[in-house]
Regions:
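A structured, charge-rich N-terminal accessory region that forms the first stable segment of a protein
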Residues: 1-47
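Short, surface-exposed beta-edge/turn micro-motifs
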Residues: 15-17, 49-51, 106-108
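A glycine-rich, hydrophobic loop/mini-helix early in the fold
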Residues: 28-87
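Short linear loop/turn motifs
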Residues: 48-50, 124-141
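Internal catalytic-core helix/loop-beta-alpha segment
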Residues: 78-107
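Short capping loops/turns at secondary-structure boundaries
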Residues: 84, 102, 109-117, 139-142, ...
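Hydrophobic/aromatic-rich, well-ordered segments within soluble, folded domains that form packed cores
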Residues: 105-133
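Long, compositionally biased
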Residues: 136-188
């Protein structure tokens, strides 16, 4: 149920990636769960009691990272001309440092999660303040469009919860949503 609640938009194919935090005892279970799916699993941080995974659809994430606006902001974060594996290694290092109170929060995670560039940049420029709405992320412009995306995420969560209540597991949910028809897979 926890995977379904935290990752419904990813599982239904309308989001490019998701963070998943679980108790450390479930680490290997999560890895096994996603090893035979179209969703890649990267351990971001392993603390004493919790682990954080970055789950993603590789092709869609690579496509998103090639958008000129995304590339420009990633370059500002110090990622220039590097591939996804290198990006994820560096993000994991920065995120782990943040979780251990050694480094500032790596805002590039917002881009890797498919958040709109304007909202990631707005968050940084405004220090997380002066947003026009707070939902799945803090919104700094295009509120109507973002509300539509949030509504789709809410609907995905409701649908996944219903499927789990009816006995579906992650594999059945992924199979059911194999060909997403949503318009907001990636918000630039």
């Amino acid at each position: 149920m926890q995977v379904g609640l935290q990752c419904a938009p990813l599982l239904t194919g309308i989001k490019v990636s998701n963070l998943l935090g679980v108790d450390r005892q479930h680490r290997d279970t999560v890895i096994r769960l996603f090893c035979t799916t179209g969703i890649s699993c990267r351990l971001l941080c392993e603390c004493s009691e919790r682990v954080t995974f970055f789950l993603f659809r590789r092709e869609k994430l690579e496509e998103y990272l090639m958008c000129p606006e995304v590339m420009a902001l990633m370059k500002a974060f110090g990622y220039s001309g590097v591939g996804l594996v290198d990006i994820l290694s560096k993000v994991a290092e920065r995120y782990s440092g943040y979780m251990k109170c050694r480094e500032p929060f790596p805002h590039e995670i917002g881009l890797l999660l498919g958040y709109p560039v304007a909202d990631v940049a707005g968050f940084i420029q405004n220090g997380g303040k002066d947003f026009i709405y707070s939902g799945y992320w803090k919104v700094y412009e295009n509120l109507e469009e973002r509300l539509e995306i949030f509504e789709e995420y809410d609907q995905a969560k409701e649908q996944v919860v219903r499927m789990i209540a009816a006995g579906a597991d992650v594999h059945k949910i992924l199979k059911f949503h194999r060909t997403p028809s949503r318009k907001h897979q990636i918000a630039v």
